């Protein structure tokens, strides 16, 4: 959801609470749990699940490797579930022409820098820059060039914008901020 008026533009940023992250976290959790159960059943010599008889999987080396993969997968899936619950990467971009201030807010990982809040004056914005990388994995990112601070990304690298969408977004934002557009192709 985005909100725009004559003087204020607020753009909400989706964080890690995306459908694909939920799917990957579930698949990884269930798969690693399966590996761990098979490794444990080969260690105990009993069938904890009826799909594989425990005699077919020897604990050394197959059971150890499956247990290791199961434990590693559980750690990775717990990392994904934590980023989903903390909603890492979500936030908003607020452009206020009336007060001449730009605010960028993102949620990070817990700790000192959990809240990432950037604030600068609109007169310090030099340009809006599009970085376009074509090829097998195309990448189109929108940056805001700030005097003395460099380029700050406004879009995520995993957002799949078409060339027309990224150009339209850059043009609208540049028009709203009254700054030029720069393009860069790789």
Curated annotation (Swiss-Prot):
Keywords: Chloroplast, Membrane, Photosynthesis, Plastid, Thylakoid, Transmembrane, Transmembrane helix. GO terms for cellular component: chloroplast thylakoid membrane; photosystem I. It holds the Pfam family Ycf4. GO terms for biological process: photosynthesis. It is a multi-pass membrane protein. The chain crosses the membrane at residues 22-42, 57-77. It is found in: Plastid, Chloroplast thylakoid membrane. Its main location: plastid. Belongs to the Ycf4 family. This is Photosystem I assembly protein Ycf4. It comes from Dioscorea elephantipes. The gene is ycf4.
């Amino acid at each position: 959801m985005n909100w725009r008026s004559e003087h204020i533009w607020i753009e909400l940023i989706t964080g890690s609470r995306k459908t694909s992250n939920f799917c990957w976290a579930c698949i990884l959790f269930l798969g690693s749990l399966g590996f761990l159960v098979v490794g444990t059943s080969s260690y105990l010599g009993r069938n904890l699940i009826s799909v594989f008889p425990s005699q077919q999987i020897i604990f050394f080396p197959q059971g150890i490797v499956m247990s290791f993969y199961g434990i590693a997968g559980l750690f990775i899936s717990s990392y994904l579930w934590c980023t989903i619950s903390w909603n890492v990467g979500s936030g908003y971009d607020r452009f206020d022409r009336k007060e001449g201030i730009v605010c960028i807010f993102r949620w990070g990982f817990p700790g000192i820098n959990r809240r990432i809040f950037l604030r600068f004056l609109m007169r310090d914005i030099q340009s809006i820059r599009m970085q376009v990388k074509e090829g097998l994995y195309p990448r189109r990112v929108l940056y805001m060039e700030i005097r003395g601070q460099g380029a700050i990304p406004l879009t995520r690298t995993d957002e799949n914008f078409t060339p027309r969408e990224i150009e339209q977004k850059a043009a609208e934002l540049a028009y709203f901020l009254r700054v030029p557009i720069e393009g860069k192709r790789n």
